[in-house]
Amino acid sequence: MSQGKVVPEELATLERLCQTVGIETGIAARIANGLRDAIVGTSAAAPLKPNSVAQLTWLGVDDASVQALQPYVMLLWVAGTPVPTPVNVNTASAEVLTAAIKGMDPATAEHLVQLRQRTPFKTLADFTNQIPALAPVSAKLDVRSSYFEVRGRLRLVDRVLIERSLLQRQPSGQSVVLQRERIASLEQVSG
C-alpha cells in the first residue's frame, strides 16, 4: 500500500504467500483492497481498519485463511498508516522467503534457512550470493529488523495473562513500545 493505492509488487508477494501456505490466491486481492478501502474509505460502508491479522475477517477473509496466514504476516500501523518494512532474511521463515523472492522455490528457501542457522547473513550481498540465479532480489529485503513482536505469559493458579507488544528499534538503538495487547483468561486446572 502506498499513498492509498495497492502496490502490484506487494500484491504479487502476498499472492505467492497465499499459494505457499495453501490458500486461494484471490485472498491476497481481498486483503489488499480491503486495507485500501479501510485507509482511504470515507463512506459509512468503508470497513474498519484491522489492527491484527485475526481482524482480517472484517475484510471478508475466512477464518481458515486467517489461521493459515497468521504465523507469517503482521499488520503494522504507525499513526494510522501502514508501514512497509523489509523482510529480514535472517529471521524469515522458508515460506516467507519463498513469497518475498520471485522465482524462489521452497527447497532453496529451506536451504537458506539452514545456512543462516549456522552463520547469519551479515549483509544482503552475502544472502544474494547464495542465490545468484534469482538476483537481483527485491529492495524489500534486509539482514536486520526494526520491528519486533514480544510475547509474554504469566500464570497464577487458574488465571493466565498473555501480553503481546510491538516494539520498534530506534536508530539510537533504544526500543519503543508501539502497541500492547493484554489478554486475561481462565485455564482448566487438571486435578
Task: Name each region found by the language model.
Residues M1-G191:
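Compositionally biased linear targeting/interaction segments
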